[in-house]
Design a protein with these regions (language model features):
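Terminal presequence/propeptide segments associated with secretion/organelle targeting
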Residues: 1-204
């Protein structure tokens, strides 16, 4: 309040800093929550998306080490059960009118049945199974890319990563506004209370 009164009294150009910061924090909050839900459900709860992504990385680079490390503790039969639960949970946490496109696929082809979707995915994909995946990676490079591009897991991977990237873009946009506001606030407070001890703005 004292700061606001000082701005009004002195005519300093800092009147919008606090309202703008408040608005930026409010606007970033849903994107932060949705990013966390995506991570907890599709990038760590169920492991098939990350496995599929690393399969594409290995296909491009020829380096299979990280992919092999993932398979060490991976249980496809368990993930087949986990994936439907994660898809169902995630849908309740995201805006109904803005979902990853895989939900449209599941609704149209499987009547919204996540379990049926997971059963078909695991039955027709090579990605969950290390022996099948390594056999594919041993093929001619063009054949590898073609096989993985047509693998059903990649549709899920692309859906999740495209959506995640769109959320991250918005999050970073608002985070930039927050960091800018914090720098401006530091400068304003330095004028408002020039003798007050405060941390360096090196981190702002």
């Amino acid at each position: 309040e004292a700061f606001t009164q000082w701005v009004a009294r002195t005519g300093k150009p800092y009147g919008n800093i606090l309202p703008d910061l408040k608005r930026a924090y409010e606007e970033i909050a849903p994107y932060n929550r949705q990013l966390n839900y995506m991570i907890e459900t599709m990038l760590s709860g169920s492991e098939i998306v990350w496995l599929g992504y690393q399969a594409m990385v290995a296909a491009g680079s020829g380096d299979k080490k990280e992919l092999k490390d993932l398979y060490k503790d991976y249980l496809p039969n368990l993930d087949r059960e986990v994936l439907p639960a994660m898809l169902s949970l995630l849908r309740t946490k995201l805006p109904a009118d803005n979902l990853p496109f895989i939900y449209q696929v599941i609704d149209e082809r499987f009547g919204g049945d996540y379990k049926a979707y997971a059963e078909e995915l695991f039955a027709n994909s090579v990605v969950p199974y290390e022996d099948k995946m390594m056999a594919v990676l041993a093929m001619d490079p063009n054949k590898v890319k073609e096989t993985l591009a047509n693998d059903p897991v990649q549709e899920l991977v692309q859906s999740v990563l495209t959506y995640y990237s769109s959320l991250l873009d918005k999050y970073l946009e608002y985070n930039h506004a927050i960091e800018k506001g914090k720098r401006e606030l530091f400068a304003a407070m330095s004028e408002f209370q020039p003798n007050a001890l405060r941390p360096s703005d090196a981190n702002f």
